Amino acid sequence: AAVAIQATLTLVEQMMSSIGGNGIMTIFEKATGKVYSLNMTGAAPKALDRESMTAETLNKGVRAGIVPGIFGGLISVLDRMGKLSLAEVFEPAIGYAENGYPIDPATVDYIQSQEEILRKHPTSVKAMFPKGRVPRAGEMFTWPDLASTLKKLVEAEQSALKSGKSRSEALQAAFDRFYKGDIAQEFDRFFKENDGFITAEDLEAYEPIWAEPVHTTFRGYDIFSSPSTSRGGLETLMQLNLVESYDLDAMGQNSAETLHLLAA
């Protein structure tokens, strides 16, 4: 379910979630009671040097990109924890991308705020401005190129299955098409043409990382998080430990005292 949701979010929450992005997953396995951490964050491109790391290049535009890790992570968790095929979990996302969904105001606002950057690239114009303008909230929004990419990944899996490969091998075939095949070459071409840094070599080197999560307790609850992120992770656990001794109920929800404590 998590993999299916993430694929669909690539379309319906594109400014925050994408198979071309990066992320962290903390997973509770009910059968064993174990908790796992999966780092789906790609590395910075090898070609990125200190002189290129400016406030402008690191925050927006083609040069801000790092190796996309989420798709590889989704394949890894689907293989290790899931039962369904990639074809099954990608089916909803492909359907929405082909047939459309009523685009929401938040996504429209985001596209509008990034219009100047998006219009620099014909592929972005084709995807984000299908009518030549910023979409209007409530309009049916399709993304045919996204559907095509998702279908290519499913095709790699299904072709492997038809040739007698195992489920794990078939999922690996989809992984390889993204990170080592024609999709990786398309990444390479785009970044070269637009003075970016990501190369096919960067993509080929990527692997998701499974790790032991960091852990603490908070008022009788076990709290787990990723050891490999600065947003959340150990920082959040430390914050919980720091406020545990305060009587937040007595201080009052959203009171000045409570907000001051949490902000500090």
PLM regions and their residue ranges:
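Internal alpha/beta scaffold segment
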Residues: 155-156, 214-216, 221-264
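Hydrophobic (often cysteine-bearing) scaffold residues that line and stabilize catalytic clefts
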Residues: 1, 70, 258, 262
